[in-house]
Amino acid sequence: MTNQRESILRYAAENFGTTPEYLWKSTPDAAVLRHRENGKWYGLLTNIPAEKLGLPSGRTVHILNVKCSPLETGSLLQKTGIFPAYHMNKTHWVTVLLDGTLPEPELFWLLEESYSLSNGNQFS
């Protein structure tokens, strides 16, 4: 487990009361972060082949998928380490590479935004 992954899980537990859910036997490290109240996802931590993000192949990378406003997607994708969402709606989600490219405060801000947007009132 990467340090950033551990930090995100700790942040989600401390700030949102979230316990990660491990839903798939085929990907036992994939952790879903969801609201207790409405069951909606606000984060997905998993490992994927680097080539799924257009990176050089031959390695596995740790990622976080977070929800974002469609108005912010374009500017977020200009940042190094943020990609069109892997396996999610690319209008409402982005994928963040957990390799230290983005500092933890920025990761936590993205997680907070995702938590807020997925509360059931917007962009469902």
Residue map of PLM features:
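Charge-dense, helix-prone N-terminal extensions
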Residues: 1-124
